[in-house]
């Protein structure tokens, strides 16, 4: 097996072990079998299952659907950076990326109830968000809701605007993406095959205040 393939397999096994999806003998655990019920990356499935305990499945399913989309939610708008930042300001949340993404999805859901195709397209254009990503996320969310119903999970369970239940659920699955603020202003990823130093950016974090920790989310 090529060296790169060995690394990929090793990384995948390590992720499953950190999630408690496999035991020390690499056998699938009961939790791992539960993860396998969802057509998701294991870390996202873990977040969905954790959301049941914290009462925020509706929010986690929406966020996971967006994270699973093949298109970025915020397309490159370098030629209109100032306009894009101003338009997206209304969605920003102090807790970071994931709540910001949820705010966008919630706003789009409201638009979908009152606007036709042209109105939805215009809303996305004015707010510099990718409609393709949102439409794909809608389809993924519908599929995930169906899985939840089949396995007896109430996907409508909501935490409203409470931050902690959602963040705790996401942390259950995204442990490898957690980073801590260092004295020099960089962030050190706390898990992974090697220590990584990360620099936050306004576009990435969509936050004005530096947090002592953050969980990265791809846009």
Question: Where do the PLM segments sit?
Answer:
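Second RecA-like catalytic domain
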Residues: 1-219
